[in-house]
């Protein structure tokens, strides 16, 4: 009896020591989650052609080790995600170069930790961390090495502004983590939105509440114990980067980059089966790269190379392209025709109309009560916004339809409006309605645009040009489709993404407007 008790005690101690061997440190806060927009729901179409596997591992740094500190959030988001985005933006796949430019978890943690967290044990909020990366930026680890309690030099804070991430949106949050569970998704949807975000070329910031078996992994694929329950350890929450997936590993698994060193599990990574992911992932956020980060020395051209390189090094550019499909609820197409417009009045293409915007008109006139929806297809990463006018000329914002919705979407995505299962119905007020959709390479203040448009006189096209000004990409640099509402615009410098409001500034802009005239009787 004494022997059996002794063995049981040894097993219990072994389990506790195993758990204590690795630190965590993610604190999930429903209030910061609620203040972060959720990525808009994509159409079913967006998930139809996803590959069986996808990986960002070629852009990952060597797995870091947080040691005994509660700094997993800084490692998952600063060390891992910021570095992956930087390497992908500048097409760096050489692991030695990636490790040279790995970002500092200390720089991030020291700015977001509690004031009384002197020994870096209290942990931090993943959303606060990502917000700091967006607003303040990051610096390389060779400038601010990993250590607790480091006093950050002002020079590092200044340099960090050159290395920001662009944006982030919540993909989902577990039950109880958002008001009325508005950010909750069913397990199948959790898997699909995570896979889709990865195929858009973005790593995912994952927050987890992990069971004991995760701390005892001895293989590349984690197999959880179905009978175990979460333990209330010092830091129940853990943050890790999600960097890929494979439908054929373990019945379908996500590739996870951890911060417990490269001796843990599969050289610092682990495959987490979809069923475990949906059970233990508490929060997932898609993080987007800022294309304007300063390139590494290895990618910079010499100041005055002789002879001149041929071809010359290209600066970072962005492209926008997409189209809109209108469908009756019967499934039939609502066809359109491109028009040259002066204040959205149809007229033939003539010389001297280059200053006008391009618009489309429906070929048919539809009766009141007609039900339809439209699909916005986004070929390259973009922010999308939609506005509609009524018969009084008032402009209404219809997308995003709520403050907690992000319309920043990645490549090869489709948004159905109002949704795949809902339709728009033309009301009894006969006449002409106008729809305006903006594709933008930078975030716009949609509410401010509406307020300014409604505060001025004139037709819709006049208001667009007055409000957006030099943010609009020049019409001569846009190729518009003639038989569908669509366009392409390529090769613009990312420097235009930060152009100031100055009518004298020469710029190609970063916004493409698509206007559609809908007549009904």
Regions of interest found by a model, annotated:
Residues 72, 237-243, 369-374:
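Conserved beta-strand/loop element in small beta-rich adapter and peptidoglycan-binding domains
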């Amino acid at each position: 009896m004494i022997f059996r008790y002794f063995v049981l005690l040894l097993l219990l101690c072994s389990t506790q020591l195993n758990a204590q061997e690795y630190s965590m440190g993610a604190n999930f806060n429903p209030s910061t989650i609620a203040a972060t927009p959720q990525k808009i729901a994509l159409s079913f179409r967006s998930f139809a052609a996803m590959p069986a596997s996808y990986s960002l591992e070629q852009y990952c740094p060597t797995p870091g080790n947080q040691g005994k500190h509660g700094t997993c959030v800084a490692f998952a988001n600063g060390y891992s995600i910021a570095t992956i985005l930087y390497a992908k933006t500048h097409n760096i796949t050489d692991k030695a170069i990636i490790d040279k430019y790995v970002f500092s978890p200390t720089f991030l943690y020291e700015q977001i930790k509690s004031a009384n967290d002197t020994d870096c044990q209290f942990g931090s909020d993943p959303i606060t961390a990502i917000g700091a990366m967006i607003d303040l930026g990051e610096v390389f680890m060779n400038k601010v090495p990993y250590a607790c309690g480091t006093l950050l030099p002002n020079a590092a804070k200044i340099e960090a502004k050159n290395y920001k991430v662009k944006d982030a949106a919540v993909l989902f949050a577990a039950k109880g983590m958002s008001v009325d569970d508005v950010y909750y998704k069913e397990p199948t949807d959790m898997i699909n939105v995570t896979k889709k975000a990865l195929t858009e070329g973005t790593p995912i910031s994952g927050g987890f509440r992990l069971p004991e078996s995760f701390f005892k992994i001895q293989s590349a694929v984690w197999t959880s114990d179905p009978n175990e329950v979460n333990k209330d350890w010092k830091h129940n929450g853990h943050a890790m980067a999600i960097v890929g997936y494979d439908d054929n590993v373990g019945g379908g698994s996500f590739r996870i980059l951890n911060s417990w060193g490269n001796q843990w599990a599969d050289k610092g990574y682990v495959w987490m089966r979809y069923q475990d992911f949906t059970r233990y992932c508490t929060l997932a956020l898609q993080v987007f790269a800022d294309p304007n980060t300063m390139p590494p020395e290895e990618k910079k051209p010499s100041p005055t190379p002789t002879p001149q390189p041929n071809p010359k090094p290209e600066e970072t550019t962005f492209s926008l392209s997409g189209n809109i499909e209108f469908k009756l609820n019967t499934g039939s197409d609502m066809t359109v025709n491109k028009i040259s417009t002066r204040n959205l009045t149809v007229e033939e293409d003539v010389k001297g109309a280059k200053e006008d915007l391009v618009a489309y008109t429906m070929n048919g006139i539809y009766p009141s009560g007609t039900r339809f929806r439209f699909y916005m297809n986004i070929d390259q990463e973009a922010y999308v916004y939609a506005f509609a006018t009524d018969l009084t000329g008032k402009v209404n914002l219809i997308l995003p339809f709520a403050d907690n919705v992000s319309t920043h979407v990645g490549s090869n995505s489709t948004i159905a409006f109002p949704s795949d299962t809902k339709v728009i119905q033309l009301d009894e007020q006969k006449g002409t309605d106008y729809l305006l959709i903006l594709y933008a390479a930078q975030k716009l203040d949609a509410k401010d645009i509406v307020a300014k448009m409604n505060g001025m006189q004139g037709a819709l096209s006049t208001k667009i040009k007055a409000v957006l000004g030099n943010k609009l990409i020049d019409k001569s640099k846009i190729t518009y489709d003639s038989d569908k509402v669509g366009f392409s615009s390529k090769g613009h410098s990312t420097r235009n993404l930060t152009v100031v409001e100055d009518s004298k500034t020469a710029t190609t802009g970063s916004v493409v407007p698509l206007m559609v005239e809908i007549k009904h009787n």
